[in-house]
């Protein structure tokens, strides 16, 4: 499995379907994502790998805050026709 940490993904199932999220960490069958608004870095959302579609964009999660995360996702969403 390729490393998904830091990758922007699109949710394909659930209440957040269609939203962009950032993978903070991953294991064999799940990813833990945040968007800085509904799901903050302090309370990550556990999603199945089957329910997310990865993009080619990877961001640095080292010094990430909820505010920076919201800004990065908004910029990506505006520039993307994904």
How does the language model describe each region?
Residues 14-17:
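Short, charged beta-turn/beta-strand-edge "cap" motif at the junction between a beta-strand
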Residues 1-5, 12, 22-82:
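Ferredoxin-like alpha/beta domains used as RNA- or RNAP-binding modules
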């Amino acid at each position: 499995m390729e490393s998904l940490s830091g990758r922007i993904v699109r949710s394909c199932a659930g209440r957040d379907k269609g939203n962009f999220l950032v993978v903070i960490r991953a294991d064999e069958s799940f990813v833990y994502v945040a968007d800085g608004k509904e799901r903050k870095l302090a309370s990550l959302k556990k999603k199945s790998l089957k329910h997310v579609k990865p993009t080619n964009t990877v961001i640095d999660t080292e010094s990430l805050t909820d505010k920076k995360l919201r800004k990065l996702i908004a910029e990506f969403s505006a520039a993307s026709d994904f």
